[in-house]
Every structure is written in C-alpha cells, then in structure tokens.
Amino acid sequence: MLIEEQNGNFAKPVLGAVPFLNEIVNMDWNKAIKQVPDKSIDLVVTDPPYGMKYQSNHRKVQHKSIQNDDNLDWLEGWVVELKRVCKDEAHLYIFCSWHNIDLFKQIVGAYFNVKNILIWEKNNTGMGDLEGDYAPKYEMILFCSNGSKKLNGGRDANILKAKRTGNENHPTEKPVNLISYLIEKSSNENDIVLDTFAGSFSTAQACKQKKRNFICFEIEEGYCRTAKNLLNGVSVSLF
C-alpha cells in the first residue's frame, strides 16, 4: 500500500480527524472509504469502472486495461458509502458511458437527486467500428445532488467542451481543466473533494490548482507512483 503526502500549494486543511487528506492513497475504494467520516465530503468527482472490460488501443498506454472493470456488482454498495460520507448539500459528478447510464441513474437515483446528464464533448473522435458505426465524440457525466445546493456562478449549458488528453497516464484519463470547471461550480476553497477511482489523479491535480482539499483512492500502484510526480509538477512514464 502506497500512501504518500504531497508537498505543495494545497488548500488549508479542514479541522477534525479526516484521514487521507491531500495524500496519494494506493488502496481499493471499498476498504479506504470505511475510514472516511460520515458527512465529511463536500463534493464527489469520480470516473468509476464502466463494467464493459475497457481495453485501450492507445499505443503509448502501458497499462491498457482497467482493474475490476468486468462487472458492476459493487455499484450499490459504493453508492451507499457515498451517501454516508457526503454532506447534506454535496454535489456529485459521476462519469458514465451510454452502455450503463440507465443502470447508474437507477441505482444512484435511489440515494441522490439525479439533476442532469452533462455531455463532455471532445475535440476528436475515439476508436471503434470504423465503417459500421458512428464515431464516439462524447462522454456522459451524471450530475447529482444530496440536497438543494446551488451552483456557483449561475446556470451554464450542459454541453461541456474540453480537449481529450493523450491518455498516456491512464487509458481513460480526464482533462484537468474539465475537472477544475466542475470543482469550481460545486465547491468552495478548502472544501473536501472525494475521488474513489483516481486513475491519473486529474481530480487531485485540479484540487491543487483550485485550493481544494482532496481524498483520492487508486487500486493500481503504478498510477499512484506516476501521480506522485504529476502532483509535484514532473511527469514520468508508468513502470
């Protein structure tokens, strides 16, 4: 298990015994989240496994598959834990695929208010059936609330445009600027943001930029070691 505290321009830590604050935590979510106190999380931004045996075709990605991405048996237990740790007015952003959006809406909606489906429009298309299907150019983000909290800065359109990354650090890497936007809309400085499937740690990088505290879990040690360098401003390859 790799748990490393990062030095840098982080948010001011909140008072109280909240474990894993502003640390890289190499641990499965279902073990780590048990240590997170009730009603301690201001915002959830996470990209869970889609349950579709994702396989990257990107030639520079060394870890091409995603651990535990072969089923969604864990989904409701995960949502129950999110309900426990989230504050009463917390927002949640959960990345989804069209393959599983109905299931996610059903299970997440049993515990939270599903407010909208945001569309992340990418600058170029993904892989797939090059002759018999339309080229994928978007991902879905389930926007949920644990209460009636308002968005910062008013109401924006639900189509979000952001360039996709090169996916060199993780096969489903998310742009830091996209995560930063979501964080700014739904949290304030020094709030605590939770990401239970950290991957490339885009959420942690965005939190560092926007002066939020983060709690991030990632089961793959290689991604955690890469994140240690990314959060210090030095990018390295996976090993």
Outline where the language-model segments fall:
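Core catalytic lobe of class I
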Residues: M1-Q6, F10-R225
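Cysteine-dependent PTP/DSP-like catalytic domain, specifically the C-terminal lobe
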Residues: Y223-F239
